[in-house]
Amino acid sequence: MKWLKKQAELYPQKQFLNDSTFAQINQEVNKMAEHLAPLIDNQSRVALLSENSVEMAVVLFALLGLSKEVLLLNRHLTEYELADQIKELKIDKVFTSDLLTEKVTDSISFSEIWTSNPCPVSLSADFPDEKIAVIMNTSATTGKFKSVPITWGMISNHVKASKETLGAYDNDNWLVILPMFHVSGLSIIMRTLYNATSATVVDKFDENQLLEMINSGKINMVSLVPTLLTRIADKLHSNNLRLILLGGEFIPQPLIKKCQELGLPIYKTYGMTESFSQSVTFNILDFPDKTSSVGRPLPGVEIEIRQADLAGVGEIWLKSPMLMKAYLGQKPYGTAFETGDIGYLDTDGFLYLLNRRKDIIISGGENIYPKEIEDLVYSLPEIKECALVAKPDAKWGQVPILFVSGNISQEKLENFLTEKLAKYKRPQSITFMDELPKNASGKILRKELKG
């Protein structure tokens, strides 16, 4: 762990994670590694299951320092799903937080690690770019997960490009509210480590706690998904924030306009697990006429639009040193990565994301882009959340159906959509819900919405 050792030597008393300094975390990591070593002596790959915590970071750093590949498990999966992933990746040792140890048979809790007999070890400092650091499993269109190997080269290229784009300042303190088993949370930890700045790790979204930390100036950076930002935007003090990194799903344009009016430093971003987080970003306050874009590529990232129509809309492909070479157990994808998203580039190089290709609804030969209709629905102040999905139809192939959460009558919503939309775009049904289903990072789970 070259970066941790370096920062502990250069900035021993600087706050790193919560109230712990770089020197303290470095010391804890080395101690943890001594207790872990005899447990995993003959293991090249292990798994880690935990809620967000400083202790999770310490265990992860220790495992990485011992040159292990670490599968980061999603804490929200069932016992069956966890067992399936552990078996598929041929893992024998699973380390869990004390809260989650019962979810995995024969797992070793963080408390139990400390009871093992310590063994003196020397942690690896440098790793070749191609060495796998962590593995993250991501959903696939087939329903079976795909395993994304995150290499040290990907991480290194990401933190450098991110620093060049977002900057790094001595007083930066990034709130880690998104899950650390997900690329959105882990990338913050790695940026903070590389930049020698600070991060505050919390386990769950607590609106009052979040507002207190931001409005008191304790933290000045945060990554959020739109559903979380929608709940707190009106209550934020913009002068205490350096940036809000916003991504993870399609961002309603009315939310962006509101943030613009409030002067909130929103950095829209576009990325994925396969690219170790962001590939594209920009500050909406710097480019007020580009707010419907997701930004410009980070240094080293190239975007290609393939199979474009006459309007320049086509499939988004990426080239980047932050990209994986292949999913585990699969062939390399070649020189460019097919994102599965549809969009276009403007003359200034800004990327516009229209939809996930798999989410586009084709009804009677006409393409319906859910984002277009969702942006329209979000323009109504009564709407909290919405999602437009496809329903199979014998006559048209597919028809759009709408799911919403909000305080609005069905009649008012139907009249609004009838006035604003062509007939083929209008939802064939509207379902009201208290809250739309979401995954651990706050994305709406469209596949669970069925008519």
From Swiss-Prot:
Name of the encoding gene: menE
Task: Tell me the protein family, please.
Answer: Belongs to the ATP-dependent AMP-binding enzyme family. MenE subfamily.
Could you list this entry's UniProt keywords, alphabetically sorted.
ATP-binding, Ligase, Menaquinone biosynthesis, Nucleotide-binding
Question: Which InterPro entries would you find in this protein's record?
Answer: AMP-bd_C, AMP-bd_C_sf, AMP-dep_synth/lig_dom, ANL_N_sf, ATP-dep_AMP-bd_enzyme, MenE
Superkingdom of the source?
Bacteria
State its role.
Converts 2-succinylbenzoate (OSB) to 2-succinylbenzoyl-CoA (OSB-CoA).
Q: Which GO terms describe its molecular function?
A: ATP binding; o-succinylbenzoate-CoA ligase activity
Name of the protein this chain belongs to: 2-succinylbenzoate--CoA ligase
The record ties this protein, via Gene3D superfamilies, to:
3.30.300.30, N-terminal domain of ligase-like
Pathway as given in its UniProt record: Quinol/quinone metabolism; 1,4-dihydroxy-2-naphthoate biosynthesis; 1,4-dihydroxy-2-naphthoate from chorismate: step 5/7; Quinol/quinone metabolism; menaquinone biosynthesis
Assigned EC number: 6.2.1.26
The GO biological-process annotations, alphabetized, read as:
menaquinone biosynthetic process
Q: Which reaction does it catalyse?
A: 2-succinylbenzoate + ATP + CoA = 2-succinylbenzoyl-CoA + AMP + diphosphate
